[in-house]
Amino acid sequence: MKTTLLSDLPNGTHATVQSVIAPSSQADPALLRRLNELGFIRGEPLQMLRRGPGGREPLAVLIGESLFALRLLEAQCIQVLPA
């Protein structure tokens, strides 16, 4: 299967983190570090639970037993491999 961005996953999709990347040269290195500290690390399974109103922000993402509400910009930094 092909990798995609977490921000592009449909609701309910299971996936595995492949990498945390800067989507542009404007990305804040502190943001990438924070995502790694939260558990978005290579090989970690996750599930995109649902999106906010209108299919936008926040994105509810489950890693292990931890639930995170991510902004679209944050989700665009996470490459995943859908299950």
Annotate each PLM feature.
Residues 1-36, 41, 47-49, 57-83:
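Compact, charge-rich alpha-helical regulatory domains located at protein termini
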Residues 52:
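Small/polar glycine-rich anion-binding or flexible loop at a beta-alpha turn
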